[in-house]
């Protein structure tokens, strides 16, 4: 899907390389032996000159600027929507294919919103030279639901998320740790990054959207429909942040146009791409957990069961590392599709 240089000669730029997702992007490129002749680490001026480990050596962070993308084939962006809006078109004009992890381009009709396990062919049409990486909570949900949607067509999804603090960045995880220490010692915790105490607490920290929903919840509604190619799918999300460092969890109720049993859902999920299925009778602690998912690639699916109140509907529990499949891994998988190495 890339024109010009062969894949073995691909030059990759990582924008926002010093952030939590940017660092994970570098680790993912290395771990998956992505075929790059050169990797460029880009960030703001205050991060320029930093050294980042890569393939047994170090990359020196360069300051992001208008000329940063000369000779770059693929630019992985994870520096926020403002940076992506400004520099995404610059990178694309310089000849790079942009894979953007921010919310800047996701709902643009000329920008594909891709999850490789769900809609890999969407990236073939990219008139702006930009491909959007979906929101972390959306990615893991659609990976788990796509096999079910193909079999019985989803009518309505009700999802409650339990999202890790790393989704808010390095500073959020640091504040969580300091708050836990303070609370354990009987002191009042410092509250700067979050709008409220996060230690020993659950709450939301996203901006308000429309109709009483947060922006995060609206992302899940709109992105799910776009990725799955079906605007008729109903999505009812409630998103909260929990005092976990890494790993988002989701309780999901799904209704279908054609009734689907839990037994059939398990058959469909076994061996589905990107999924690790946790089966067996319910037992305390036997479900997928963020602590076990952290630092791993799969989307873990468990607690698959028939809904006792709604015949033909099922409930399931979905967990994934939000920095990996929820961000960096998905972006690198898109890059692999571009160079034909997936």
Predicted regions and their residues:
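N-terminal Rossmann-like NAD(P) cofactor-binding subdomain of oxidoreductases
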Residues: 2-198, 232-234, 267, 299-300, ...
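Charged docking surfaces used in two-component/phosphorelay signaling
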Residues: 10, 75, 165-342
């Amino acid at each position: 899907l890339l024109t010009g240089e062969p894949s073995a000669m691909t030059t990759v730029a990582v924008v926002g390389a010093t952030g939590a997702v940017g660092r994970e992007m570098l680790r993912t490129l290395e771990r998956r032996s992505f075929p790059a002749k050169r990797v460029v680490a880009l960030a703001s001026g205050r991060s320029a000159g930093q050294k980042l480990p890569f393939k047994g050596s170090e990359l020196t962070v360069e300051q992001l600027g208008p000329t940063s993308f000369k000779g770059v084939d693929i630019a992985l962006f994870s520096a926020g929507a403002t940076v992506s809006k400004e520099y995404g078109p610059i990178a694309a004009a310089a000849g790079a294919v942009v894979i953007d992890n921010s919310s800047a381009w996701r709902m643009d009709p000329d920008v594909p919103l891709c999850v490789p396990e769900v809609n890999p062919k969407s990236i073939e049409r990219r008139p702006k030279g930009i491909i959007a990486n979906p929101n972390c909570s959306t990615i893991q949900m659609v990976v788990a639901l796509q096999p079910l949607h193909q079999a019985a067509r989803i009518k309505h999804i009700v999802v409650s998320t339990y999202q890790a603090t790393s989704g808010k960045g390095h500073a959020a995880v640091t504040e969580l740790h300091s708050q836990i220490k303070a609370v354990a010692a009987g002191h009042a915790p410092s509250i700067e990054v979050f709008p409220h105490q996060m230690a020993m607490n659950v709450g939301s920290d996203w901006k308000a959207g429309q109709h009483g929903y947060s922006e995060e919840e609206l992302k899940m509604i709109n992105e799910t429909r776009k990725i799955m190619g079906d605007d008729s799918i109903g999505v009812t999300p409630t998103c909260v942040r929990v005092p976990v460092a890494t790993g988002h969890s989701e309780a999901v109720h799904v209704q279908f146009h054609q009734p689907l049993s839990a037994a059939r859902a398990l058959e469909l999920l076994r061996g589905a791409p990107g999924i690790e299925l946790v089966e067996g009778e319910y037992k305390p602690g036997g479900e997928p957990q963020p602590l076990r998912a952290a630092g791993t690639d799969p989307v873990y699916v468990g607690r698959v069961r028939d809904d006792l109140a709604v015949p033909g509907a099922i409930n399931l529990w979905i967990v994934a590392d939000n920095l990996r499949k929820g961000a960096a891994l998905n972006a690198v998988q898109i890059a692999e599709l571009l160079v034909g190495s997936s």
